[in-house]
Amino acid sequence: MFFQAHRPGIHGAFFYLRSQVGILSDFHLFRENADRLFEKSEKKSNLYRFFTGIENQIPQPQITPMSRIRFRSKTRDSEMNIFTDPLSPWRLPLRFLYPANWCAEGFEEDLAWIQAHPEARNAGNLLTDSSGKQVWRVELPDGRGVVAYKHCEGKAPSRYILNLSHPGREWRNYQAIARLGIPAGEVLAFGETRRHHWRILNSFIITRFIENTRDGTDFMPGGRRHGDAAMRRRYCMLIAPEIAKMHRHGFFHKALHPRNILYRGETPESMEVFFIDVARCRMRFQWTMMQFLLFDLYTPLRDLKLPADEARAFLKAYHDSSPDCPFTLAELEQRLTCYRRHGKVFDVVNGAPAM
């Protein structure tokens, strides 16, 4: 019958209950909960106003634009913009959010010299030459140091109409690597050239050259140090905690080939490792990292073809450095003994051939 009250619907029901003696004897508790529930609401509901009798005592919050939403970083206490910060999984590769050209402070003169003397760059040591990408070792004048100059052609121009260029992504990923405290190359400058502000013609990135280093292909079958078990084991023990650190913060490398992980030192005790070529890296949400971390572990194990005991030691070092790993050590080994890739099943722990 109380639905026949003056206030129709749900309001009529509560009007009837309010008129009954003792029904809302603990009304002050309801009001306290209502204040806590609706204090961040832009508009107070009719139900809230009906019970509390107040409408404008709580200040209205300001609506924050989506582009200014911020959150706390896992690695620092300061706030960050979730769409541009290098450690945010929300960050977008849109080139309008980032500079088209960037130079480290104090490197402007050297950058101008490199751009004005392309013959000096081309005369340097050519480190790699792949499809649309060349990397040179360039010595700066007056003994100001040595840099690595990577030049990329405008390959697949439609892919970069709205997105960052290949060096632009690498510059952004190096920022994340530096924030995590992982040893890697230091970016000094990057830039790109576009036609009509849309089609990318070429781009470049300059990093400080890491002297006296070699890449991890030395430890692959046929490599210069493949038979040096002590150096190979030390190499794996050094990169495992760094990979775990990446994954703990949602950093998916996507290209953990030994050629992209340099080492320096002639003895296991003096060895250091450095990560390079991070253009393909992505930030991912933690709940999606299961498949990505398996791929990042599969890649170096497949390339190095480690003996079973060394492969298990590598996984144990990774797991010990990753307390939030979604797998137990046994589950991690089991997943990588039957890892499916391109329709084939790989056993990268025991070194069995693909099936």
Please name every model-derived segment.
Residues 263-269:
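Activation-loop N-terminal segment of eukaryotic-like protein kinases
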Residues 271-351:
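C-lobe/activation-segment region of protein kinase-like
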Residues 256, 261-263:
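Hydrophobic residue at the +6 position relative to the catalytic HRD Asp in the kinase catalytic loop
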Residues 6, 12, 17, 29, ...:
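Short, low-complexity, charge-dense intrinsically disordered segments
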Residues 113-214, 248-249:
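Conserved ATP-binding subdomain of kinase catalytic cores across diverse folds
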Residues 79-123:
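Juxta-kinase regulatory segment immediately upstream of eukaryotic protein kinase catalytic domains
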Residues 173-176, 180-183, 213, 219-254:
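Conserved kinase catalytic-core helix
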Residues 211, 258, 280:
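Short, glycine/acidic-enriched loop or turn micro-motifs at the edges of active sites
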